[in-house]
């Protein structure tokens, strides 16, 4: 498996992600919430045998970095762990996590913050002195 890192408006991003982001099954897996990107995003894309098996977009915001929509084919834990391991923020990393993926994010060092019905806010603190 290869993890690609692409800027939010790179043409290659749209070629890789477009077919998935417009696929009704993928949108259902994301609770029918559309995927979005701007120049403030970095995308981490898992590719295996020329197929995209998952992606994690990370948005840079004033308080840190945010993962708020991601996709992994068949909820493959190994792919999600690899994608999360590729993300190396310089600041706090927040994630809005689907409840079914809470244990995976927790095992990758994220801590639970507020819990909602379908999602959990989690944080990975990159400043070890806090």
Regions found by a protein language model. Name each.
Residues 1-30, 129:
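Short amphipathic alpha-helix that is part of the acyltransferase structural core
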Residues 45-59, 66:
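Conserved beta-strand in the GNAT
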Residues 88-100:
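Conserved GNAT acetyl-CoA-binding A-motif
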Residues 47-49, 123-126:
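Active-site beta-strand termini and strand-to-loop segments that position acidic
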Residues 59-68, 115-118:
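A conserved beta-turn-beta hairpin within the catalytic core of GNAT-like acetyltransferases
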Residues 73-90:
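Conserved acetyl-CoA-binding loop-helix of GNAT-fold acetyltransferases
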Residues 22-47:
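Active-site rim helix/loop that mediates acceptor-substrate recognition in acyltransferases
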Residues 99-118:
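Conserved active-site alpha-helix within GNAT-family acetyltransferase domains
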